[in-house]
UniProtKB/Swiss-Prot annotation:
GO molecular function, one term: nuclease activity
Segments carrying motif Nuclear localization signal: 8-15
Cross-referenced Pfam families: DDE_Tnp_4
Domain DDE Tnp4: 187-353
Protein's recorded name: Protein ALP1-like
A Gene Ontology cellular-component term: histone deacetylase complex
Membrane-spanning parts: none
Gene source species: Arabidopsis thaliana (Mouse-ear cress)
Cofactors demanded by this protein: a divalent metal cation
Known EC number: 3.1.-.-
Enzyme class, broadest EC rank: hydrolase
Keyword Hydrolase in record: yes
Function (record text): Transposase-derived protein that may have nuclease activity.
Annotated compartments: Nucleus
Amino acid sequence: MGPIKTIKKKKRAEKKVDRNVLLAATAAATSASAAAALNNNDDDDDSSSQSLDWWDGFSRRIYGGSTDPKTFESVFKISRKTFDYICSLVKADFTAKPANFSDSNGNPLSLNDRVAVALRRLGSGESLSVIGETFGMNQSTVSQITWRFVESMEERAIHHLSWPSKLDEIKSKFEKISGLPNCCGAIDITHIVMNLPAVEPSNKVWLDGEKNFSMTLQAVVDPDMRFLDVIAGWPGSLNDDVVLKNSGFYKLVEKGKRLNGEKLPLSERTELREYIVGDSGFPLLPWLLTPYQGKPTSLPQTEFNKRHSEATKAAQMALSKLKDRWRIINGVMWMPDRNRLPRIIFVCCLLHNIIIDMEDQTLDDQPLSQQHDMNYRQRSCKLADEASSVLRDELSDQLCGKNSSA
């Protein structure tokens, strides 16, 4: 099933959202140009020193005069260094397409002003009217600036989200935290809840199992909670296994283009290929290991589920952190544009990775939650092939043996 065939633009939007699958080969070149842009910040009109001057004037105009860095971080949820880097990414697009953006008093908005508006909109989840009132501009200006920012980030920040060419470090970290060998990622799905008119028949496809209208985001995550692959846009009515099987990630793995590295021997007749882990909502596959459902019936099953749970925490916490920091996709969105929403979700994922890549520790002192889908029950998928079940059993036996001899 395709994602909403009645919307002609939908497939184009999804292809754009899942483009990290297609653009991995160009990531290095894009990364180099972005690094050059970052290194040239000293020569930019928006360099660090001038950016400090901008915050001084901006904060006095909007927030009553506090120029404390902590105030900046509480407003935008990122450090000044990260903010300046994001400005450097979008500068070319914002200046190449001049627009007469101004506040309510007719004062032109600088690059930093516009990035601030977009980040506040994405980070706070506040309505266009509230953002407009806060920043002293009309709602349409807030909307146009935010969308231009989203379009620019899709292109300029794509190198921050791509499948890695080497997985050794990722596998090593997963084994260190969970004891699972050859694990390359953790997968999970979260719901972006929307308020849609229930009387419209076309909206029924968005109605999920918890009676919410929602759109899904599927993410594969590394041990550092960094997104490696994402796809957004499928209706919440679809089960996790259906979303998975319609994703670019699934198709690439099935074609042997992902998770195709070194295999580890488990026994004389069984090898453990590269794989990811996911909860019981996903099918048990040779490359996707899920936990034993119900109450474990043996020590090996108990040991496997324990280790599996440690590995899957990365995906759960990453999605929780994403929705907590970029609150436009948290809570309930009021009648969003369903063609644009997947692209907004994708840019929030890019921003999430940028914060990690910049080693930005803003808000790191806040406790991490594993709950990213409040009031959603865990659903179970019964799909499993015999070979995958045998593989999981042999891995469980080996893990239990290692544990016993430790």
